[in-house]
């Protein structure tokens, strides 16, 4: 509580204090108009920058959605299409079939090489990965078997290839291979067991036998009884590949669409 007598006993002090207050107030500068302009300009710059960032996000999301989905067909002559026209091998037929089914934004890259062994395939992975595949269909090992290469070596190479592809963001579909029993039943069984074992251990989708429905049928293979005809490749595409591949394409396209939608939604800018 304030003592009123003490307050009245000090009029000069109060008057002096009021005088000082008036003098100080009179000496204060008016707000600088340049400072206000600078503040307005800063706010405007921040707003423009935020709008630019939002536009860039929308552009990047649109480009991602429009960028083709890349499927890499990686393997040996069975992939390359030895002995058939360029539009008859399985990668070409697969892309054409996908287009017919409405997947207009999907491209299939043929990276098959005749005579390729699992070791050779591993050695060219750096070059192959430049395609940045979203999905890779990997079929290799037949030439290793023809040469009688140790099963452990073949499996190690396939595991290396799968891991490299996965590390680079590609989902792998592994095409299983089976061989004739002229190499001995032990080798044949050990070789066939590679593919399901790798698929299970490395969490990849397996086509149990890539040539299922075609291998061993003279009507669907060329004179060498090894490489499919155009008709044989058609069966491989429609029956062996598409049932496994289509759900993966659908999932990837949905993910791209969701990413684009989220990125194109404007965020609130605080000014």
Language model: regions and residue ranges:
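Conserved Rossmann-like nucleotide-binding pocket used by diverse enzymes
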Residues: 23, 109, 173
């Amino acid at each position: 509580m304030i003592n009123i007598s003490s307050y009245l006993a000090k009029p000069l002090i109060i008057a002096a204090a009021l005088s000082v207050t008036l003098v100080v107030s009179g000496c204060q500068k008016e707000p600088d108009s340049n400072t206000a302009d600078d503040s307005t300009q800063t706010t405007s710059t921040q707003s423009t920058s935020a709008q630019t960032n939002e536009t860039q996000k929308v552009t990047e999301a649109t480009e991602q959605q429009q960028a083709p989905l890349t499927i890499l067909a990686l393997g040996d002559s069975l992939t390359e299409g030895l002995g058939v026209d360029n539009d008859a091998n399985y990668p070409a037929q697969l892309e054409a079939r996908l287009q017919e089914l409405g997947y207009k934004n999907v491209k299939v890259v043929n990276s098959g090489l005749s005579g390729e062994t699992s070791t050779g395939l591993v050695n060219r992975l750096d070059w192959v990965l430049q395609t940045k595949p979203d999905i890779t269909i990997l079929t290799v090992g037949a030439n290793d078997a023809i040469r009688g290469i140790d099963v452990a070596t073949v499996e190690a190479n396939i595991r290396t290839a799968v891991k490299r592809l996965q590390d680079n963001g590609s989902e792998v579909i592994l095409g299983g291979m089976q061989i004739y029993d002229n190499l001995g039943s032990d080798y044949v069984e050990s070789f066939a067991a590679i593919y399901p074992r790798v698929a299970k251990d490395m969490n990849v989708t397996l086509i149990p036998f890539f040539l299922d429905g075609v291998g061993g049928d003279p009507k669907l293979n060329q004179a060498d009884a090894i490489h499919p005809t155009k008709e044989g490749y058609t069966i491989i595409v429609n029956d062996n590949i598409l049932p496994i591949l289509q759900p993966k394409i659908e999932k990837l396209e949905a993910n791209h669409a969701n990413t684009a939608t989220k990125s194109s939604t404007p965020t609130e800018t605080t000014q």
